[in-house]
């Protein structure tokens, strides 16, 4: 029996009025059992069958919507105690109009697209994002109701803050006034179509009473003594983890008789505690500078052979350019390690000032120990190979490109995913995130305007990108102004109003346009996308002050903006030519005169969570795999690259399955036909770093840049060393996020093939070389690699 026939026979008779009946029934219906059986039948096919994947997702949505309130009246009755007062009152006041909006959405293409995103998308939405009641038979918020809740929250903030109301009115293009429902409908259109994708905290908590909407926090406490250390871990960090967010923690100042490993175990234990029976995982990343006397103990904390290793902790190191310069000159020379109690200025300084202080301390004999530079480098690389981390930051790049002078209070750490660059000081830095789904910006050339050979040819629409960025600025600022603050330090840090707007689906855009990831056309489009995004975000933020009468962010008077300078102008030789120079000049002059609402704008974060929901490639990365598997809270699910399989010709499917979707191993003519679907492991990582450098001037925070390496490349430490040195020479802020290694294993050899006629996976080429199967990003990366739902 075909999938279509199965659905018609077993599901066709389910009446529409059954929707919502399970809210009170509390038992599995015949429809649910039938649908679940079909899902189980489809799940073995979803890795390569786009229709099976879409059908499994639609069925899961149907099962779960039977557990959702059927009307907004029911919704308020169930979730009234959870919603904030303003949001609840707004829904009650506009209940009919909102109901009409939701009904229209369920008839729209946007809703169809959401249903067709596949099984993993449907599972992720209900497992992670929507509200639910407690108990053994929970009632769930529907996906449409979730988007409505967030949109209503944004509208409430617009009504409360004049500058946001002005921006909403400007976006809707109403010169005089705009109704509150018009704001909801406008924002809802972008969120529900997943053109603008909000970070997990926003989707889960916007509109909820006391909702904490920031994604990550950064702490830079003094840990010079035991009371200071305990205060940092329990007074500062614990409330942040309790708020279901990620934390970046600088431990470079750790200096007393205890070992850093004991301190890290305390952090690890807290993360483990807060993740116990927690729907949304939290995480913490500890950062240390490379000159610290306990750096080797720090790097050993996650090694698999360490019986006391910190399973739940992530790590990062901040390296001064001095280390790389000395290594390039003579790797056999000594690298000196210091106790921060005797070398406190090394934490505060960067650049020439750091170099001078380091040399002074060496001459004065203030060091604790020393080791050859090559030994320090090997220790770092050994840890990377075994654990996939620590993240690697370049201290000078973090500070030289910051929006204000940081000499004397240098930045030396980041957030949980190493894409946020802020100066915590005595406050707590805050990450407020969203991302633009770039494939939603693709448009088709109208056949009436061009010849038939160009009909249906896609192009990237920068106007659509600009509109989405403006909506993201509105949504994030609504969350900044309307979110709760777990600690006083967060409230102070939020005054900088730092945003992090990222992207997802860049690889899908290139593939749809027929570009290989490293083609010249891709490189140009990549850079232009980020220049356009940065300009639009800065201009919109400025207009919140200029036209909306908003107050500039705290500290703008001493920022580069007050001098009319932009982030890209701190990069030597950079010319922003996609946006005409006279527009940059006029904008800079106006900002210097009137101010700007936000301090930071773009960040390239890993979009693991929201990319699973949309089905597009994560962040700016090339495709991980064309067939992969994903472990959810309950099961392991095959995940297809939908963009790839939509392009696969029916006659080629047998070959695709035989080679596990690995284009690099296809026969020559198939390899050429599908060359734009090579994976990240097939591209030169040095060239991927070059691409990161090309977009870096327009990413004023940083980029979570991972290395994607085949296993044979990490057998020699020199390859990783050369990658780190290349990133240093390029001047990147984040040299490495994770080191993902493609191991020599095959998913195809293990998977159960639904079609008995499908060819078995041979596992080996004729010449005896290993034949890769479909790649599982979770298995390819180290065990430390998280599915970072904390940020996205």
From Swiss-Prot:
SUPFAM superfamilies: PFL-like glycyl radical enzymes, R1 subunit of ribonucleotide reductase, N-terminal domain. It is an enzyme of class 1 (oxidoreductase). Keywords: ATP-binding, Disulfide bond, DNA replication, Early protein, Host-virus interaction, Nucleotide-binding, Oxidoreductase. Substrate binds at residues 200, 215-216, 246, 415-419, 606-610. It comes from the Viruses. The record marks 788, 791 as: Interacts with thioredoxin/glutaredoxin. Residues 758-781 are annotated as: Disordered. Gene3D superfamilies: 3.20.70.20. Ribonucleoside-diphosphate reductase holoenzyme provides the precursors necessary for viral DNA synthesis. Allows virus growth in non-dividing cells, as well as reactivation from latency in infected hosts. Catalyzes the biosynthesis of deoxyribonucleotides from the corresponding ribonucleotides. Belongs to the ribonucleoside diphosphate reductase large chain family. Heterotetramer composed of a homodimer of the large subunit (R1) and a homodimer of the small subunit (R2). Larger multisubunit protein complex are also active, composed of (R1)n(R2)n. This is Ribonucleoside-diphosphate reductase large subunit.
């Amino acid at each position: 029996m075909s999938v279509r026939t199965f659905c018609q026979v077993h599901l066709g008779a389910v009446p529409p009025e059954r929707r919502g009946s399970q809210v009170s029934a509390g038992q599995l219906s015949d429809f649910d059992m039938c649908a679940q059986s079909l899902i189980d039948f489809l799940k073995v096919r979803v890795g390569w069958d786009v229709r099976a994947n879409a059908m499994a997702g639609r069925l899961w949505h149907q099962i779960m919507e039977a557990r959702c309130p059927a009307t907004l009246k029911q919704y308020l009755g169930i979730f009234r105690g959870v919603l904030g007062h303003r949001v609840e009152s707004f829904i009650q006041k506009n209940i009919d109009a909102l109901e009409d909006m939701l009904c229209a959405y369920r008839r729209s293409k946007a809703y169809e697209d959401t249903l067709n995103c596949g099984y993993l998308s449907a599972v992720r939405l209900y497992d992670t994002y929507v509200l639910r009641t407690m108990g053994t038979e929970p009632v769930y918020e529907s996906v449409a109701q979730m988007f409505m809740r967030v949109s209503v929250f944004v509208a409430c903030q617009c009504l409360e803050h004049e500058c946001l109301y002005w921006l909403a009115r400007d976006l809707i293009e109403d010169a005089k006034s705009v109704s509150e429902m018009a704001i909801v409908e406008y924002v809802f259109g972008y969120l529900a179509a997943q053109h603008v994708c909000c970070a997990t905290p926003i989707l889960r908590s916007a509109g909820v009473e006391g909702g904490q909407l920031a994604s990550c926090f950064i702490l830079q406490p003094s840990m010079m003594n035991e009371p200071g250390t305990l205060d940092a871990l329990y007074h500062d960090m614990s409330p942040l983890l309790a708020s279901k967010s990620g934390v970046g923690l600088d431990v470079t100042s750790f200096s007393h008789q205890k070992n850093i490993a004991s301190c890290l175990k305390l952090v690890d234990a807290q993360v483990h505690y807060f993740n116990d029976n927690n729907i949304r995982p939290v995480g913490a990343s500890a950062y240390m500078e490379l000159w610290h006397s306990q750096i080797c103990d720090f790097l050993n904390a996650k090694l698999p052979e360490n019986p006391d290793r910190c399973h739940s902790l992530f790590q990062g190191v901040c390296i001064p350019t001095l280390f790389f310069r000395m290594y390039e000159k003579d790797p056999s020379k000594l690298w000196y390690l210091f106790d921060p109690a005797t070398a406190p200025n090394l934490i505060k300084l960067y650049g020439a000032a750091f170099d001078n202080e380091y040399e002074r301390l060496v001459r004065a004999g203030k060091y604790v120990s020393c080791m050859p530079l090559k030994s320090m480098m090997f220790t770092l690389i050994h840890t990377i190979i075994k654990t996939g981390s620590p993240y690697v930051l370049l201290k000078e790049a973090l500070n030289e490109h910051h929006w204000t002078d940081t000499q004397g209070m240098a930045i030396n750490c980041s957030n949980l995913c190493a894409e946020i660059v802020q100066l915590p000081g005595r406050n707590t830095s805050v990450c407020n995130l969203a991302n633009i789904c770039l494939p939603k910006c693709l448009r088709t050339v109208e056949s009436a305007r061009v010849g038939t050979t160009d009909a249906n040819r896609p192009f990237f629409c920068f106007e659509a990108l600009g509109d989405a960025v403006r909506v993201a600025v509105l949504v994030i600022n609504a969350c900044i102004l309307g979110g709760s603050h777990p600690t006083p330090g967060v409230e102070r840090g939020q005054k900088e109003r730092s945003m992090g707007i990222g992207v997802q689906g860049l690889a899908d855009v290139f593939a749809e346009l027929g570009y290989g990831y490293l083609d010249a056309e891709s490189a140009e489009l990549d850079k232009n996308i980020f220049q356009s995004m940065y300009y639009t975000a800065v201009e919109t933020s400025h207009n919140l002050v200029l036209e909306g009468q908003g107050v500039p962010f705290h500290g703008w008077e001493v920022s580069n903006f007050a001098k009319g300078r932009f982030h890209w102008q701190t990069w030597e030789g950079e010319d922003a030519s996609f946006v005409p120079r006279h527009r940059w000049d006029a904008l800079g002059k106006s900002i210097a005169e009137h101010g700007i609402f936000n301090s930071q704008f773009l960040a390239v974060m890993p979009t693991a969570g929201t990319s699973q929901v949309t089905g597009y490639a994560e962040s700016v990365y090339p495709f991980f795999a064309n067939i992969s598997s994903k472990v959810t809270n309950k099961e392991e699910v095959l995940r297809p690259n939908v963009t790839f399989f939509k392009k696969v010709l029916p006659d080629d499917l047998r070959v695709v399955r035989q080679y596990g979707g690995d284009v690099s191993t296809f026969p020559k003519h198939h390899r050429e036909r599908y060359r734009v679907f090579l994976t990240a492991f097939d591209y030169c990582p040095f060239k991927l770093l070059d691409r990161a450098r090309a977009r870096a001037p327009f990413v004023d925070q940083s980029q979570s840049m991972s290395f994607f390496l085949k296993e044979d490349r990490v057998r020699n430490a020199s390859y990783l060393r050369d990658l780190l040195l290349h990133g240093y020479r390029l001047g990147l802020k984040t040299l490495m996020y994770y080191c993902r290694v493609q191991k020599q294993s095959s998913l195809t050899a293990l998977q159960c093939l639904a079609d008995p006629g499908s060819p078995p996976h041979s596992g080996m080429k004729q010449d005896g070389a290993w034949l890769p199967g479909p790649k599982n990003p979770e298995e390819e990366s180290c065990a430390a690699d998280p599915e970072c739902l904390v940020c996205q």
